[in-house]
């Protein structure tokens, strides 16, 4: 399954003027992997790029019904502090996902890293939106590279 699985990592803050372009590039990258035989797409369920990636997978699922959206969530309380609108979007994605996995029960200091490592450890490709050489996305991209996972940075 790992050889047919792609994960995503990207920044939470996405410039509003770039969302459509980022969505289109993400969709294009996913479709390229589908054509190579990828079926499983793991998304971390965060705001920003994760949300864009989830919607891109769901849109492509209309044309490629065999693909699967797998939400890999860091904890049950991930949405604490989110706006009602963001929670509703999250719940919509969660409802449409083919599978939901939690890597921790409760929020802890390291639960986001644990979720990111789980995504990478179960994938052979990673589509990223990395524009800064710092933070969780930077860590996850470097972790993926160290594990021999193919990284496709749509920000390049």
Language model: regions and residue ranges:
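Acidic/glycine-enriched connector segments
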Residues: 1-156
